[in-house]
Amino acid sequence: MEPKPEELEKKKVVRRKFIGKRSSVKGDEASLVKSANKTRHVGRVMNQIPQEILNDKDLNEAIRLLPSNYNFEIHKTVWNIKKNGAKRVALQMPEGLLIYSLIISDILEQFCEVETVVMGDVSYGACCIDDYTARALDCDFIVHYAHSCLVPIDITDIKVLYVFVTINIDEQHLINTIKLNFDKGSQLAVFGTIQFNPTIHSIKSKLENDEEKTMYLIPPQTMPLSKGEVLGCTSARLNKEQIKAMIYIGDGRFHLESSMIHNPEIPAYRYDPYSRKFTKEYYDQKQMIEVREDAVKIASNAKKIGLILGALGRQGNPVTLNNLETKLSAKGIQVVKIILSEIFPQKLSMFNDIDAFIQVACPRLSIDWGYAFNKPLLTPYEAMVMLENDTKWNETYYPMDYYSKEGYGRGKVPDHSNVI
């Protein structure tokens, strides 16, 4: 018997982000495939890797120590390190992958004859790539794991290799779940983190060619991100008249919430590839809008504003910071520039004489955690709205385009007048 949808009780007090609620939806338990497809998703770069590396028996034996459904692209890494003549290599990865860091370190030291440095600081996303610290540690090469090429390799201080760590999952169960929960011919926006990007394009092709129950999957794109890729601060604006629902593939809600904030009128679902649960997700857009409006209103009366540049890797953008400083000063507002690697309520509470803060780091810090600070903490977009240099949001649209081609995260000044 198919399980009935069960609504989780919405929390009355928001304590950590606007988590909202979720409900479970139908899953095809009978069609479970017990083992994931272990075929590696290999790019065209494989053709460029010398055969002596691809066929190195000792190297391939060492690679077997890593999980078979995680593609750490060891062959490509070895080839790039050798090709660039690197001597000291930094390895940067999110906390969830640090368990594999020593195995990778040993492999690279043995087969590349280099010294490796495992960077232990937090890495929340591609914006946190820390080539500055790597260079300070005398590294001449850095491998950044599990995130896309958000920061171009031609502007970093040392050579960079991005390894997406694509993960193979049980595609058939995901396909069966989508077919069970949506009507034939449905147009669905499907996206996820970069790890599951190959899966998204694979199931898109299979469902579009499914004669029994054809589905039309659309991997939305926000340039310059990949099709089907979503970030916690950057997602595509979708046409609610064309898209029946949004499906996010990944664990957690952080990235999905970006699309939910950007498209509050489109139903959202999440498929967790680890638990294989398919849930309908909810976000309290109204409450978020009210909290952000209050923050901007209070900050508009500020005489002294703390302008924070995020120093966690390349999270902060100096161009955006300088642009905000110029506009604030032109309004007669005193500016105090602050550099912080991580922004905590306790730390900002020490600045007693500052009336409000604007952080050029991660917009989700303000959206998710703004209520926890004793003074307003605005994003660059909210600050520009306050200064009447950008169009204000409304209940059906709050832009999530921070790292888009023309976004504030790239030092640009986007124009939202045509979408709000």
UniProtKB/Swiss-Prot annotation:
Main location: cytoplasm
Intracellular or extracellular location(s): Cytoplasm
Catalyzed chemical reaction(s): L-histidyl-[translation elongation factor 2] + S-adenosyl-L-methionine = 2-[(3S)-amino-3-carboxypropyl]-L-histidyl-[translation elongation factor 2] + S-methyl-5'-thioadenosine + H(+)
Any Pfam family hit: Diphthamide_syn
Record-listed [4Fe-4S] cluster binding positions: 127, 233, 362
Cystine connections: none
One GO molecular-function entry: metal ion binding
Domain of life: Eukaryota
Cell cycle recorded as keyword: no
Cofactor note: Binds 1 [4Fe-4S] cluster per subunit. The cluster is coordinated with 3 cysteines and an exchangeable S-adenosyl-L-methionine.
GO terms classed as biological process: protein histidyl modification to diphthamide
EC number: 2.5.1.108
Keyword tags: Cytoplasm, Iron, Iron-sulfur, Metal-binding, S-adenosyl-L-methionine, Transferase
Keyword check for Disulfide bond: no
Cofactor: [4Fe-4S] cluster
GO cellular component: 2-(3-amino-3-carboxypropyl)histidine synthase complex; cytoplasm
Pathway assigned in UniProt: Protein modification; peptidyl-diphthamide biosynthesis
Family: Belongs to the DPH1/DPH2 family. DPH1 subfamily.
Functional summary from the UniProt entry: Catalyzes the first step of diphthamide biosynthesis, a post-translational modification of histidine which occurs in elongation factor 2. DPH1 and DPH2 transfer a 3-amino-3-carboxypropyl (ACP) group from S-adenosyl-L-methionine (SAM) to a histidine residue, the reaction is assisted by a reduction system comprising DPH3 and a NADH-dependent reductase, predominantly CBR1.
NCBIfam families xref list: diphth2_R
Self-association and partners: Component of the 2-(3-amino-3-carboxypropyl)histidine synthase complex composed of DPH1, DPH2, DPH3 and a NADH-dependent reductase, predominantly CBR1.
The protein's name: 2-(3-amino-3-carboxypropyl)histidine synthase subunit 1
Natural source organism: Debaryomyces hansenii (strain ATCC 36239 / CBS 767 / BCRC 21394 / JCM 1990 / NBRC 0083 / IGC 2968) (Yeast)
Lineage: Eukaryota, Fungi, Dikarya, Ascomycota, Saccharomycotina
Gene of this entry: DPH1
